[in-house]
Amino acid sequence: MAEAPQVVETDPDFEPLPRQRSCTWPLPRPEFNQSNSTTSSPAPSGSTAANPDATASLASASAVSTDFMSNLSLLEESEDFARAPGCVAVAAAAAASRGLCGDFQGPEAGCVHSAPPQPPPTGPLSQPPPVPPAAAGPLAGQPRKTSSSRRNAWGNLSYADLITKAIESSAEKRLTLSQIYEWMVKSVPYFKDKGDSNSSAGWKNSIRHNLSLHSKFIRVQNEGTGKSSWWMLNPEGGKSGKSPRRRAASMDNNSKFAKSRGRAAKKKASLQSGQEGPGDSPGSQFSKWPASPGSHSNDDFDNWSTFRPRTSSNASTISGRLSPIMTEQDDLGDGDVHSLVYPPSAAKMASTLPSLSEISNPENMENLLDNLNLLSSPTSLTVSTQSSPGSMMQQTPCYSFAPPNTSLNSPSPNYAKYTYGQSSMSPVPQMPMQTLQDSKSSYGGLNQYNCAPGLLKELLTSDSPPHNDIMSPVDPGVAQPNSRVLGQNVLMGPNSVMPAYGSQAPHNKMMNPSSHTHPGHAQQTSSVNGRALPHVVNTMPHTSAMNRLTPVKTPLQVPLSHPMQMSALGNYSSVSSCNGYGRMGVLHQEKLPSDLDGMFIERLDCDMESIIRNDLMDGDTLDFNFDNVLPNQSFPHSVKTTTHSWVSG
């Protein structure tokens, strides 16, 4: 191996030659290496070492090949060098070695070189013309300019130009993709040896790319099945140069077109909607546009026009927050106030809602689960008052919205309401009511289920302290005129019903006075399952225990057996919920008996205004819970029960 260079030195004709590189871009020009084949040995030979001319030719050949590659890659920079007024140092060094100022150096540069003349190398026909020593300067740039004008390895034609020639050369002016490949291999010398699959991958991909890139080529579907499409020239011309890709351009155009179509469709729809309404104003046809000035002309004004009816409808159902001033509007009629405050949804309900004196009606208890629909007729209750001629019993009828028809009136506004409770009852307001003054035993008929929003006024305007007393259980069969006890087991159990002491109703309805009485006996056969009592207004009492009210029979006869003046409580006697049991309002006398003079009657520890504003006006629940339970008190009236038929309608 070490002697190999010596063998080469003895026989310079077999020097190693540089092998051309294949499948590279840009391809090196073979003529420059072939021209220098005799002097391109990497190993110095004896003849070349002894011959200075051979050494100079070797240096010049290496400089030419190196300078060619630099000029091929940096064509613009070399042209700048040619336009320079003088030789650059690199070009001067190359010229000193090979007798040239540069590939693109003109005679105007004025460069002087002292290199000895050398014979022109011989090469193949494709080799650029040799530069003679005398005309080396003016002819040096000619081959380089020719090579720089070539756009591709096969010439100045681009792929698009080659494809155009291929399609135009066909008889039908159309070719398939495979036919274009074949034409390239046959017609272009550069692609003759690149028809195989290994070397054709690059240029075939370029052809496909150019076919789809340029708009001058169009694809036509082939008639036959399973055949590739025809590629033709666009008859409308199209762009021959590079244009944006169809896919990107179509995406942009489609998105913009879709937006414009959407705007046009909206405008058309708005115009049509405006034309459909003949009575609308001219600006109404643009009402659907959110940014138009007339966009709020129709829809929003309709909403504002229905604002007041909506609030009034909310007021009609206790679901909305009501103002307490509503009940104090004097200019409204009774029926008007009732229609605004109380819900009209109860179809079978009477025109007025019940007072606390009518809570004991079984029609209310029977239908409490049916949204307070009164499905039963009012029952009868006999209240017998026996007193001396000097005694006067003042009872108050329930306030009704209907005009007062009663003829029994009294200047005294005191009145009492007697109720019983198994559920939470809202306090009944105070209103001026008729009083019953009678020295005889009379029957005060219970009115129907009548109540009023004016009862709220009573809560706000009451002066005397409200009393919620739990009556002590007293034997109902024994009359105690001296002890002045109002019995009937006032704190009602789950199976007992305390009837209300009704008063003369505004409608003067006597409730079945034909009930037979048993003065000495009281049958408490009423069974109230759970704590079921309706509210004054749309309230849901303790529904967990309020299952069903069975028909009850409760006898009651109230003999008032000693002279007195029994006046009702000045404000109200409310039945409220305390552990599910109602408490009966007590008769408050103008003068307490001697045994009760020192007893302090506690005032309810609650703010009625806050209760009205928060609980009653908010609607859903009107369940008043007064936690203070007053001690049992006895009052100067004995109660005798009479048999009374509580038969539901």
Curated annotation (Swiss-Prot):
It is found in: Cytoplasm; Nucleus. Keywords: Acetylation, Activator, Apoptosis, Autophagy, Cytoplasm, Differentiation, DNA-binding, Methylation, Nucleus, Phosphoprotein, Transcription, Transcription regulation, Ubl conjugation. Residues 154-248 bind DNA. The record marks N152, Y159, R219 as: DNA-binding. Transcription factor that is the main target of insulin signaling and regulates metabolic homeostasis in response to oxidative stress. Binds to the insulin response element (IRE) with consensus sequence 5'-TT[G/A]TTTTG-3' and the related Daf-16 family binding element (DBE) with consensus sequence 5'-TT[G/A]TTTAC-3'. Activity suppressed by insulin. Main regulator of redox balance and osteoblast numbers and controls bone mass. Orchestrates the endocrine function of the skeleton in regulating glucose metabolism. Interacts with LRPPRC. Interacts with RUNX2; the interaction inhibits RUNX2 transcriptional activity and mediates the IGF1/insulin-dependent BGLAP expression in osteoblasts Interacts with PPP2R1A; the interaction regulates the dephosphorylation of FOXO1 at Thr-24 and Ser-250 leading to its nuclear import. Interacts with NLK. Interacts with SIRT1; the interaction results in the deacetylation of FOXO1 leading to activation of FOXO1-mediated transcription of genes involved in DNA repair and stress resistance. Binds to CDK1. Residues 303-320 have a biased composition (Polar residues). Residues 33-62 have a biased composition (Low complexity). Phosphorylation by NLK promotes nuclear export and inhibits the transcriptional activity. In response to growth factors, phosphorylation on Thr-24, Ser-250 and Ser-313 by PKB/AKT1 promotes nuclear export and inactivation of transactivational activity. Phosphorylation on Thr-24 is required for binding 14-3-3 proteins. Phosphorylation of Ser-250 decreases DNA-binding activity and promotes the phosphorylation of Thr-24 and Ser-313, permitting phosphorylation of Ser-316 and Ser-319, probably by CDK1, leading to nuclear exclusion and loss of function. Ubiquitinated by SKP2. Ubiquitination leads to proteasomal degradation. Ubiquitinated by STUB1/CHIP; when Ser-250 is phosphorylated. InterPro entries: FH_FOXO1 (IPR047408), Fork_head_dom (IPR001766), FOXO-TAD (IPR032067), FOXO_KIX-bd (IPR032068), TF_fork_head_CS_2 (IPR030456), WH-like_DNA-bd_sf (IPR036388), WH_DNA-bd_sf (IPR036390). Residues 1-62, 112-151, 228-339 are annotated as: Disordered. The modification Omega-N-methylarginine is found at R245, R247. This is Forkhead box protein O1. The gene is Foxo1. The modification Phosphoserine is found at S206, S212, S228, S229, S243, S250, S281, S292, S313, S316, S319, S323. The keyword Ribosomal protein does not apply. GO terms for cellular component: cytoplasm; nucleoplasm; nucleus. Residues 357-453 are annotated as: Required for interaction with RUNX2.
